Amino acid sequence: MPIKLKGKIVSGLGVGAKYVQLYRGVFNKYLGIDPYPGTLNIDIGQDFFIYTKKLKAKIIPPPRKGLGCVLAYPGILMGIKIYVIKPCITNHGRNILEIISDKNLRKTLNLKDNDIVEIIIYDEEDYSYI
């Protein structure tokens, strides 16, 4: 069963583009998307993993030694298919959702810091029905 979360758009740490580029090949292989080089960050104000205990993530292996795996949860943000990614090694708190898509979400959806958005997150096995 999908979960719905609301959160606030926030600026990231400025390294999302670098890491999306590093993981681009494995995101393409395991998720079937060629991601935009960057992430959209959403602060949900609480620990994300409280909500995901009932959801199965897709585990993305690291593209090379020295990097960690990534948990990927499929979802929908304002009508656009996305993935919530939770890197196993990160400087973000558990309250921050990092979102990847094949689109520049800030530009496509005209989002600014402090905008409130709702995101629907699915079990990775249910995503094919969207």
UniProtKB/Swiss-Prot annotation:
<dbReference type="GO" id="GO:0000166">
    <property type="term" value="F:nucleotide binding"/>
</dbReference>
<dbReference type="GO" id="GO:0009231">
    <property type="term" value="P:riboflavin biosynthetic process"/>
</dbReference>
<comment type="similarity">
    <text>Belongs to the archaeal riboflavin kinase family.</text>
</comment>
<feature type="binding site">
    <location>
        <position position="41"/>
    </location>
    <ligand>
        <name>Mg(2+)</name>
    </ligand>
</feature>
<keyword id="KW-0547">Nucleotide-binding</keyword>
<dbReference type="Pfam" id="PF01982">
    <property type="entry name" value="CTP-dep_RFKase"/>
</dbReference>
<keyword id="KW-0285">Flavoprotein</keyword>
<dbReference type="InterPro" id="IPR039063">
    <property type="entry name" value="RibK_CTP-dep"/>
</dbReference>
<dbReference type="InterPro" id="IPR023465">
    <property type="entry name" value="Riboflavin_kinase_dom_sf"/>
</dbReference>
<feature type="binding site">
    <location>
        <begin position="12"/>
        <end position="17"/>
    </location>
    <ligand>
        <name>CDP</name>
    </ligand>
</feature>
<keyword id="KW-0808">Transferase</keyword>
<comment type="pathway">
    <text>Cofactor biosynthesis; FMN biosynthesis; FMN from riboflavin (CTP route): step 1/1.</text>
</comment>
<dbReference type="GO" id="GO:0009398">
    <property type="term" value="P:FMN biosynthetic process"/>
</dbReference>
<dbReference type="InterPro" id="IPR023470">
    <property type="entry name" value="Riboflavin_kinase_archaeal"/>
</dbReference>
<dbReference type="GO" id="GO:0000287">
    <property type="term" value="F:magnesium ion binding"/>
</dbReference>
<protein>
    <recommendedName>
        <fullName>Riboflavin kinase</fullName>
        <ecNumber>2.7.1.161</ecNumber>
    </recommendedName>
</protein>
<keyword id="KW-0418">Kinase</keyword>
<feature type="binding site">
    <location>
        <position position="98"/>
    </location>
    <ligand>
        <name>FMN</name>
    </ligand>
</feature>
<keyword id="KW-0460">Magnesium</keyword>
<dbReference type="GO" id="GO:0008531">
    <property type="term" value="F:riboflavin kinase activity"/>
</dbReference>
<feature type="binding site">
    <location>
        <position position="39"/>
    </location>
    <ligand>
        <name>Mg(2+)</name>
    </ligand>
</feature>
<keyword id="KW-0479">Metal-binding</keyword>
<keyword id="KW-0288">FMN</keyword>
<dbReference type="InterPro" id="IPR023602">
    <property type="entry name" value="Riboflavin_kinase_CTP-dep"/>
</dbReference>
<feature type="binding site">
    <location>
        <begin position="103"/>
        <end position="106"/>
    </location>
    <ligand>
        <name>CDP</name>
    </ligand>
</feature>
<comment type="function">
    <text>Catalyzes the CTP-dependent phosphorylation of riboflavin (vitamin B2) to form flavin mononucleotide (FMN).</text>
</comment>
<feature type="binding site">
    <location>
        <position position="90"/>
    </location>
    <ligand>
        <name>FMN</name>
    </ligand>
</feature>
